[in-house]
Amino acid sequence: MAVQSTPKTLKEKLGGRNIFLIGMMGSGKSQTGPVLAKMINYAFVDTDDVIEKASKQSISSIFEKDGEKVFRDVEKKVLKEISQHHSLVIATGGGLVTLPENWGILHQGIVIWLDLDLRRSIKRLESDHKRRPLLLGDNLAENFSQIYESRKPIYLESDLRIEVEDQSPYEVATMVAEHLQSILIDQEPQAERHTTEL
């Protein structure tokens, strides 16, 4: 069997490229990101946290006061600023992928879609949907499903799709790290591959 990469060699193979976690709200990006970052000796950044700290207000407040367009513009600027740095695991807002210009930045790194199934996503969001401005309304499940279906073709532009069920953040991060190895091996020139078979 193949010898697994250590965190050090995985980091070396990444060459400082940022890892962007995308996916719907409630998919676990903010929980998985720090664990993954620790595994591969990267730093972790959450775009929503950066926006809230810089604006000194919650995401829902920005939506309510200024509207989604203003928020997306702020989000785009934050993404651009963060991407000036390297060796980061970056958890992005669920709708960040909807702006085509953001993909120019995302594709500079490795884009990983955490795809939590609809039933589990809705169950997670039922307790805190008031913090999710796009889900406000009478029918959370219907609103969520419509948003998911509209974004799914965009999420499919990712380099890697991880189907999430009931795994812990550690388990999801481990899955990501394992699949990252395969992606990086596929991207290596054939002559540079050094996987050892036992």
UniProtKB/Swiss-Prot annotation:
UniProt enzyme class: transferase
Localization in the cell: Cytoplasm
Gene Ontology CC annotations of this record: cytosol
Pathway entry: Metabolic intermediate biosynthesis; chorismate biosynthesis; chorismate from D-erythrose 4-phosphate and phosphoenolpyruvate: step 5/7
Residues annotated for substrate binding in this entry: D48, R72, G94, R151
Catalytically driven reaction(s): shikimate + ATP = 3-phosphoshikimate + ADP + H(+)
InterPro entries: P-loop_NTPase, Shikimate/glucono_kinase, Shikimate_kinase/TSH1, Shikimate_kinase_CS
Highest taxon of the lineage: Bacteria
Cofactor: record remark: Binds 1 Mg(2+) ion per subunit.
Keywords: Amino-acid biosynthesis, Aromatic amino acid biosynthesis, ATP-binding, Cytoplasm, Kinase, Magnesium, Metal-binding, Nucleotide-binding, Transferase
Residues involved in Mg(2+) binding: S30
Gene3D superfamilies, per database record: P-loop containing nucleotide triphosphate hydrolases (3.40.50.300)
EC number, UniProt record: 2.7.1.71
PROSITE patterns, alphabetized: SHIKIMATE_KINASE
Binding site for ATP: G26, S27, G28, K29, S30, Q31, R132, Q167
Cofactor(s) needed by this chain: Mg(2+)
Predominant subcellular localization, coarse grouping: cytoplasm
Task of the protein: Catalyzes the specific phosphorylation of the 3-hydroxyl group of shikimic acid using ATP as a cosubstrate.
Oligomer status and interactors: Monomer.
Family statement: Belongs to the shikimate kinase family.
Stored PANTHER family: SHIKIMATE KINASE, SHIKIMATE KINASE 1, CHLOROPLASTIC
UniProt protein name: Shikimate kinase
Organism: Prochlorococcus marinus (strain NATL2A)
